[in-house]
Amino acid sequence: MPYTPLAATLALLIPTPGQAQAQPPSLQDQFNTATAAWERHDCAAALPLFDALGRDPRIKPGSLPAAAIAVRRGDCLLRLGQSEAGEIAILSGLPILRTAGDTFTPEVAQAEVALGKLAIARWDHDTALAHLETARDLLKGDERASVLMLIAMLTAFDGGTKGLDAAAEGLKIAEAAPKPDKKQLVQWHTARGRILLNQGLAKEGRTALTKALDLAGGLTAHASLTDAVMRADLAQAAMLNRDTEGAYQYMAASGAGRVGSSPFAKAAAMNPPLCGPDTGLEPADTAVVEFSIADDGKVDSAQPVYANGSYAKATAFARAVSHWQWRPEDAAKIPLFFRVASRVELHCTQATGEGGASPVLPLQDRLDRWAFPLIAPYHPAIARITGWPQWLAIAEAAQKAGDTKAEIVARTYLAPLDLRAPTTALASIDHALTLATSPDTLPPEASNATRILLTSTRTATLRRQERRESSPTEQEKRADPALLALADDALIAQDPLAQDTAVLLGLAARPRSAEAAEAQAHLARVATDARLPDHHPIRQFAQLRLANDAARDGRLAEAQTWFAATGLTQEQCALIGPKPALTGVNNGASAFPWDIMRWGFEGWVRTEYDIKADGHITGIHAVIAYPPFIFSKPAQEMMTTARYQSSFRPEGGAACSANQTTVNFKIPDNQNTVKIVQKKS
């Protein structure tokens, strides 16, 4: 968009002859220099000059020069990544520029578009649309095209005609060019196709997308990133038209699911959005979200492509994806082609945790109450800490300040979130353990809690290094000697909550037969620990495990006694009880459908379901799937064969609600994968 001529502004800045001695002659030069740098997008040079002009007492607040300086300064702040400050600056000057006449119209339109994009980035639909429509109405001819595309994509989930009208006008502009640009025509047909799909017009949407594909050269053996995205759109359209074979063909041609090792399943943080009033999502809602992964493993862009609901629902799914994260070393293994744009199918989850409560929560809560005031000087908004980099920064700041207590606490909270290399993460844990074990460093209860939490995370980190994903049941049979030894520590033994937590964390979820009696004895001591209240969550956790074990052995009267001791209803047990261990599932070659295998697809599905008291599962559905819609049904069919340990429930209710398991579909020595070809420079 062309910049605004500055004649109207400059006339207000040039001093009159009678003022020549009062005003430095460099003011006009500063303005000209700043504007010239802004025109050529050299904001590193322009911003300091605009800052100086904004502070200059000769620039009258509320004047047109002040407004122009504020808007251009704000534009530079946006370009330099300072979104909040940039938005404030633009909003402070824009009202005056809006009334300054036609000379400033292009600049006002540019500012409106910038504000619209900021609103889109924070999922503010109505504010974004208001700014974009204002910009559109200020522009004429082909200058409207880029704004029309933004409006079309923003309103794709709204229903009505706004999105389709914007796409139709954009297409008309592109077709009216003396030499129509095929790339632009492809973009407009694609936009129209997506909008139609999201309005439930699958047949019409597929027709528009097919037109885009034809203009782009058809289905070939090679695919650019643009081609891959277009083919994924057509796969979506074919699936919505119940053309499964066509969907497989287009999805295969996009390269999705044919990367070789299905790397996206290895995310360190990957949660679907919750169902319920906070998100507005219901179990029947679904979406496909396209996202990109930065070098540090964070998602730096996430946008909904398809949803069967409104903009609010579509973006609720995209917001969830925006918080996903991969370890940097895992992200580096994903080919750049797929890191730039990949898609997943999403449904909301009814799980608020990982299925079954962890016995660590009461100890964690106790530590939080003591520790959070120590952290406040380093990060007052603790609730807004969302990842390991912030905890690491707090730990390092506390270490630099010689604040050992705060450093130990920060490293304790850092440990389970740490996405650095395992050796680095373990070094941080060991350093914190050394500090926490030193006499008189922490109050006894805080020392006990940090030592137990750090030791538990240390074991989990070491086990991740063992790469034993192929036999998850094996790890469920292994106790943690380090935690069981901590339970016998003289200081921890005087702290019932800490000691019992260490025992429960240290016991195997599914002990080997030779260790079962010892595990039962440990559980009984925790279940009957009179140092804790009768219905303390730690005692309830142990009592439920004992009830389950007794029921599996046919000791139903004993199981009833332990269950009654919890004081819980069976519905409460399904939410907070220990998660049953998986005992078997048919995950052999027969579970991989041939009609999918022959295309060379590999992928994964995170399934969610309830585990019944008899170990069978019910209510199976997919919550995340890659590639979209390919493996969702096979994963659900496979999980119907899963069996878990039985659990005691007097009325046979659920043993564990909203449990989640990831099902991987892999082809050994798969030769039907895509090859990434680097463009010659």
Protein language model regions, located:
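Gram-negative bacterial Sec-dependent N-terminal signal peptides
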Residues: 1-19
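Charge-biased low-complexity segments
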Residues: 21-157, 161-165, 169-681
